[in-house]
Amino acid sequence: MGIEMAMVRPPRCLLVNVTTGESMECLFNPTQLTEKVQVNYSRLAVPGLSHQVLQFQSTGNRQLSGVEFYLDRFFATEQPGEPDILDFHAFLRALTVPPEGTEGVVDTAPPRTLLIWPDVITVETVVTDVEFQYRQVAVDGTVLVYAATVTFEEILDARVTSEALREEV
């Protein structure tokens, strides 16, 4: 591997609002990713038995918790197009509320989010939690550096089997 490879920008994580088609590329890729799946069992107490019988109920949705997106105004000004770091803030906030003009229980949910991180993960989710931490603010109140910590939960529209998961790469 030559020095030219050191200058190649790695693929960036991308978030897509499935409802509007709007997408936002991450300024930096998250430094870590925690994936959690919960398996739910009913605990059946049988009189006289020394233990509880576990009966499978369901598998919970895959969760990606505490995904941290770091945004730095100084770094952003050096990028093509000089992205405004607060646009990412507005994009994430828009993923937490229903879109305008929706009516009815089914439609009045926040939009789904497609999380695409090349060679790592691609998953359709909803945002279940967002926390913004403003780490550096200028004297005039301009946000210079902040982190957005997001929890995503996978949305599945079809039954998943263990065989199908074994085939995923």
Regions inferred by a protein language model and the residue ranges of each:
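Acidic, Ser/Thr- and Gly-enriched intrinsically disordered low-complexity segments
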Residues: 1-169
